[in-house]
Amino acid sequence: MSAKAKSKEILDKDVWAVDEKIGKVKEIEIDLDDWRVTQLEVELEKDVAESVLGAKKGGVRNMLVISALEKGTIRRTDKGLLLQIRKDQLHVYLKPVDAT
């Protein structure tokens, strides 16, 4: 049996890189051809945005490219979403949010 979650169970949940909180889930992007979650829009913590992206302000949102993560690298826990990657690896999986 597969694990399931409703969007409201994921939105605004904390996102952790190994043991450090890096932000909160703000949006979910789904590939409508095969109904897979491909990206999570994460509002990064101010210190994470500064250290990983060089941003000078808080509230920076970036897309976390789920499809680039290996299976089992991300999982849901009581704390939120846990990424089995270090904060210094985040730049590989983040891309700017497209303006709408």
What are the language-model segments listed below?
Residues 1-100:
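Peripheral interaction segments used for macromolecular assembly
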